[in-house]
C-alpha cells in the first residue's frame, strides 16, 4: 500500500484519539484535538514533557513532514480548526481526514461539531455507550453497555437498564492499552491490521460522542473505523480524478464533493457452502466437517483481504462478513471497478478448477455519494425518510445484482472449459472417499482421498490447537490448504508467525480467537470452534438416557430485512445509517463467532438434565457464521444449548431479533448429509410459525415458540412428570408408553374414556393416593386441550429419552 495512503488512514483512525485521553483526565490541556496531538507526541515521538507542559502548538520544527501529516489529521478534523488553519496557510493540501470525519460524523450524529465544543447541549463525559438496539425496530428502550473492553475470557456485554458510569479510571486503563501499540507506530499493512484490532478491543464500548442531547449509541471504534474507510476511498478517488489539491476539492468545495459518486458499495457472496460442508461420507466425519467448515471461513476471509489488497485498502473498509457473504466500501474509480471484475473472474476460474460447479462467487457494486450516507444540518423528517430509503435501496440493488449473476454464472470461456470435462464437470477416474470428487484424487489406498481432503485431514487436529492460534497466508508453500490466487494457508505458533513475517512469500497473518491488545500481530479473526470430543461416537456415550446425537441448525429470522430496514422505523429513518448497520453487523458476528464459544464452555441453563451448570457442553460447533449455526453433540446438551443461545441472543438484541431452529436426534453412524437435510427441514418448519421465532424438536409435529418450549413443555409438563417418577423410573416408563399411545389416538371419541379408565387403574390402592391424584388431574386437564396435549406428548418423549437405559431402534 502507498505509504502516504497508510499515513492518511492512520490519521483518520487516530483523529479522535484525544477523546479517551481527555476523559481519563491525565493532565493534558485543551480540547480533545489538542490533547490527541500532545498525547501522540509524547507516546509515539517520545516527547519527554509532562502532560501539563504541552501547549496547542502545531509548528514543531523538529517533527518531519511525514509525521506531521498524521498529527495534523488529529488537530484539523473540526470545521473551526480547519478554517483557522486554512486562513493561516497551515492546512495540508493532501490531507483527507477532515472531510472523512465530516461524512462519518454526519452519518451517526451530530448537533455539535465536537463534544467539547460550544454546540454541545449537554456534555456528559461519564456516559456509557447505549445499545444500538434501542433505536432498532419499533419500541424505544434505554439500555446501556457496561463500560469495559472486549475480552475473550468474558461473556458478551449485554446491555442493561442500569447505568454504570464510564469514569476516568476506566478510561485510564484503555489509554494504557492504546499506548502499547501507538508507541511503535509504523507505516505498514501489518501495523494497520493490528491497530484496527486494538482499537476494536479497547473502544468498542466507548461512546464516540458524549453529547447527551443526542443518541449516544455509536462507539468510538465504529466512528474511527468508518472515518478510516472513507478517508482511504477519498484518497483513491482524488488520485484517480487527478485532483492533487485536496484542500480545494474537499474543503473549499465540500458541498460539491458531497454530491459526487465517489464511493462504491460492493458485496460478494459465495454459493454452495452448505452442500460443500455436508457432502461427505467417511470415517472421522466430525473432524472432516469442522475442517471443511473452517476452510470455507478462511476462504471467505482470504477473498476479502485479496480484494481489499487489490484495490489498496485495509480492513477498515470491510463493513460485514459472515456465511460466505461480505460488504465493503470501495472508491468509485475505474481501477477499483476493474479490480472487482478481475477478482470475480479469477476467483471463479480457481473455484471451477478445484471444485467444478460446487462453489461460485458473485459480486455486485453500486456507486453512492456522501449525501447518500449523511444526515444534513436541519434535515426535515421527509428528507431523513427519503435519505434512509435511498440507503436501504442500495442493498436491494446489490441483492438483485447477485441474484442475476447466480442465474447466469459463467462466461463463455468458462463454459467451454466445463464442457471439455467429463459429464459431471470433473476430471479423473477415481473418486475421493470423503467428498466424492474425481478431479483431484491422488492417493491410492483403501480410502482414496483427493489432495484437498488429505490437506483437510492433516489440518483438522490443528484447528483447535492452543499452540497454533496463528494462520499464515503464503505464496508457493508446498504444504497446507490451497486458496485462490496462488496462496496457501498454514497453521503455526506465535514464534513461527513472527519469523514468517520476515519472509517475502508471507502475504498476511491472522490471530485466531484472541484479543492481543497492544501487540502488532496482524488481523484478528473470530471463529466459532468449540469442541468437546473429536468423534461423534463419544457424544453418544456421554448423552444421558438414550444414546443419540443431537443436531441443531439455527439462524436469525429475517436478517436481510433487518439489515436494510431495521433502523427505519424510528425517527423517520434518521437512524438508518452506515455507521449503525456496520456496528450492527459487527456485533452480530461477534455474538455468533466469539460469544457462542463462551455459551458452550460456560453454560447456565440445565432445564432438562438438572446437571451442574458449570459443566461444559458435550458438543462441537460444525459451523457458526454471520447468523447461521450448526452444532452436533450429546442430544440433551444440544437441546439445552439451543434454548440458552436463544435466551442470550434475546437479551443481547432486546428481543428485537429472533432466531428459529431445528433440532434432531440420530444414531452416530447416520450419514451427516442426511442429518443436515432433515434438521434443515425441521428449521423450515420452525420458520413457518407466525412470526417465526420457534423451534421444531425431533419432528415437524413438535414445533413450538421458544418460550412455549421452555416454560410449557419443559418447565411445566416435563418437570411435572420427572418429579413424580423420581426414583421409580421403571414403573414410569410403562405408564408413559401407554399415555403416548392414547395421546396418539386423542381425536377418537372413545379414547377419552380409555384415558380416564387408564389413569384410574394406575392408582396404587395400598399407598398414599393424594400425590397420584394430583399428578393424574394435571394429566387429564392437559389431555383435554389440544395445545396442552401436544406439549404433554413432547414432554413425555423427552422423559423417555432422558431415562431410557438401553438403546433400541
From Swiss-Prot:
Molecular-function GO terms, alphabetical: ATP binding; endonuclease activity; exonuclease activity; RNA binding; transferase activity
Gene3D superfamilies assigned to the protein according to its UniProt record, in alphabetical order: 3.30.70.270
GO annotation, cellular component aspect: extracellular region; plasma membrane
Residue stretches making up the HD domain: 1-98
Miscellaneous remark of the record: Encoded in a type III-A CRISPR locus.
Similarity comment: Belongs to the CRISPR-associated Cas10/Csm1 family.
Written domain comment of the UniProt record: The N-terminal HD domain has ssDNase activity. The C-terminal GGDEF domain has the cOA synthesis activity.
Protein name, per record: CRISPR system single-strand-specific deoxyribonuclease Cas10/Csm1 (subtype III-A)
Source species of the chain: Mycobacterium tuberculosis (strain ATCC 25618 / H37Rv)
Amino acid at each position: 500500500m502507498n505509504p502516504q495512503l497508510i499515513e492518511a488512514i492512520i490519521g483518520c483512525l487516530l483523529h479522535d484519539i484525544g477523546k479517551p485521553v481527555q476523559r481519563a483526565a491525565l493532565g493534558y490541556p485543551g480540547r480533545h484535538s489538542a490533547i490527541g496531538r500532545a498525547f501522540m507526541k509524547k507516546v509515539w515521538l517520545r516527547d519527554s514533557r509532562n502532560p501539563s507542559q504541552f501547549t496547542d502548538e502545531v509548528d514543531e520544527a523538529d517533527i518531519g513532514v511525514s509525521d506531521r501529516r498524521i498529527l495534523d489529521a488529529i488537530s484539523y478534523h473540526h470545521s473551526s480548526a480547519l478554517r483557522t488553519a486554512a486562513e493561516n496557510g497551515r492546512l495540508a493540501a493532501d490531507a483527507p481526514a477532515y472531510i472523512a470525519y465530516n461524512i462519518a460524523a454526519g452519518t451517526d450524529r451530530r448537533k455539535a461539531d465536537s463534544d467539547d465544543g460550544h454546540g454541545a447541549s449537554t456534555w456528559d463525559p461519564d456516559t456509557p455507550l447505549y445499545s444500538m438496539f434501542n433505536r432498532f425496530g419499533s419500541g424505544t428502550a434505554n439500555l446501556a453497555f457496561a463500560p469495559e473492553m472486549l475480552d475473550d475470557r468474558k461473556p458478551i456485554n449485554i446491555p442493561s437498564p442500569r447505568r454504570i458510569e464510564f469514569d476516568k479510571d476506566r478510561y485510564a486503563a484503555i489509554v494504557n492499552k492504546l499506548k502499547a501499540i501507538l508507541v511503535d507506530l509504523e507505516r505498514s499493512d501489518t501495523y494497520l491490521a493490528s491497530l484496527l484490532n486494538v482499537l476494536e478491543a479497547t473502544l468498542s464500548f466507548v461512546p464516540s460522542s458524549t453529547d447527551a442531547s443526542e443518541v449516544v449509541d455509536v462507539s468510538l471504534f465504529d466512528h474511527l473505523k468508518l472515518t478510516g474507510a472513507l478517508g482511504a476511498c477519498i484518497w483513491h478517488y482524488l488520485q484517480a480524478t487527478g485532483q492533487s489539491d485536496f484542500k480545494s476539492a474537499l474543503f473549499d468545495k465540500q458541498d460539491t464533493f458531497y454530491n459526487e459518486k465517489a464511493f462504491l458499495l460492493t458485496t460478494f457472496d459465495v454459493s454452495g457452502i452448505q452442500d460443500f460442508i455436508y457432502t461427505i461420507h467417511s470415517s472421522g466425519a466430525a473432524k472432516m466437517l469442522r475442517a471443511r467448515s473452517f476452510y470455507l471461513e478462511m476462504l471467505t476471509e482470504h477473498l476479502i483481504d485479496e480484494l481489499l489488497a487489490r484495490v489498496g485498502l485495509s480492513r477498515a473498509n470491510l463493513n460485514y462478513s459472515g456465511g460466505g457473504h461480505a460488504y465493503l466500501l470501495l472508491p468509485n474509480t475505474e481501477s477499483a471497478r476493474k479490480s472487482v471484475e478481475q477478482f470475480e473472474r479469477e476467483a471463479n476460474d480457481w473455484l471451477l478448477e478445484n471444485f467444478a460447479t460446487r462453489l461460485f462467487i458473485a459480486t455486485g457494486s453500486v456507486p453512492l455519494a456522501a449525501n447518500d450516507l449523511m444526515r444534513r444540518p436541519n434535515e426535515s423528517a421527509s428528507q431523513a425518510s427519503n435519505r434512509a430509503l435511498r440507503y436501504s435501496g442500495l442493498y436491494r440493488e446489490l441483492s438483485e445484482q447477485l441474484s442475476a449473476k447466480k442465474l447466469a454464472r459463467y462466461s463463455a470461456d468458462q463454459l467451454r472449459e466445463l464442457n471439455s470435462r467429463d459429464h459431471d464437470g470433473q476430471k479423473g477416474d477415481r473418486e475421493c472417499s470423503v467428498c466424492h470428487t474425481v478431479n483431484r484424487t491422488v492417493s491410492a489406498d483403501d480410502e482414496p482421498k483427493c489432495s484437498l481432503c488429505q490437506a483437510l485431514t492433516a489440518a483438522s487436529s490443528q484447528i483447535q490447537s492452543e499452540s497454533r492460534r496463528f494462520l499464515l497466508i503464503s505464496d508457493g508453500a508446498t504444504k497446507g490448504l490451497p486458496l485462490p490466487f496462488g496462496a496457501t494457508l498454514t497453521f503455526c505458533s506465535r514464534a513461527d508467525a513472527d519469523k514468517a513475517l520476515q519472509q517475502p512469500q508471507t502475504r498476511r497473518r491472522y490471530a485466531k480467537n484472541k484479543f492481543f491488545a497492544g501487540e502488532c500481530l496482524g488481523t484478528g479473526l473470530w471463529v466459532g470452534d468449540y469442541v468437546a470430543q473429536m468423534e461423534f461416537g463419544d457424544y453418544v456415550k456421554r448423552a444421558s438416557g438414550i444414546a443419540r446425537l443431537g443436531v441443531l441448525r439455527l439462524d436469525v429470522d429475517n436478517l436481510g430485512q433487518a439489515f436494510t430496514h431495521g433502523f427505519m422505523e424510528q425517527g423517520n429513518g434518521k437512524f438508518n445509517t452506515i455507521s449503525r448497520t456496520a456496528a450492527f453487523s459487527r456485533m452480530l458476528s461477534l455474538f455468533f463467532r466469539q460469544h457462542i464459544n463462551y455459551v458452550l464452555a460456560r453454560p447456565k441453563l440445565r432445564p432438562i438434565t438438572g446437571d451442574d451448570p458449570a459443566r461444559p457442553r458435550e458438543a462441537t460447533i460444525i459451523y457458526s457464521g454471520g447468523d447461521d449455526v450448526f452444532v452436533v453433540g450429546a442430544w440433551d446438551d444440544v437441546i439445552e444449548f439451543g434454548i440458552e443461545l436463544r435466551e442470550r441472543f434475546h437479551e443481547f438484541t432486546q428481543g428485537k431479533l429472533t432466531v428459529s431452529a431445528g433440532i434432531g436426534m440420530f444414531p452416530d453412524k447416520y450419514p451427516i448429509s442426511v442429518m443436515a437435510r432433515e434438521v434443515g427441514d425441521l428449521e423450515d418448519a420452525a420458520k413457518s410459525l407466525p412470526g417465526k421465532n420457534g423451534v421444531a424438536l425431533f419432528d415437524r409435529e413438535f414445533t413450538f415458540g421458544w418460550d412455549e418450549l421452555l416454560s410449557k413443555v419443559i418447565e411445566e409438563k416435563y418437570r411435572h412428570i420427572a418429579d413424580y417418577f423420581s426414583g421409580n423410573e421403571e414403573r414410569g416408563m410403562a405408564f408413559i408408553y401407554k399415555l403416548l399411545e392414547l395421546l396418539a389416538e386423542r381425536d377418537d371419541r372413545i379414547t377419552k374414556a380409555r384415558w380416564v379408565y387408564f389413569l384410574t387403574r394406575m392408582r396404587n390402592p395400598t399407598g398414599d393416593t393424594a400425590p397420584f391424584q394430583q399428578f393424574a388431574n394435571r394429566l387429564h386437564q392437559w389431555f383435554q386441550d389440544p395445545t396442552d396435549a401436544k406439549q404433554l406428548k413432547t414432554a413425555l418423549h423427552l422423559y423417555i429419552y432422558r431415562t431410557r437405559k438401553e438403546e433400541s431402534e
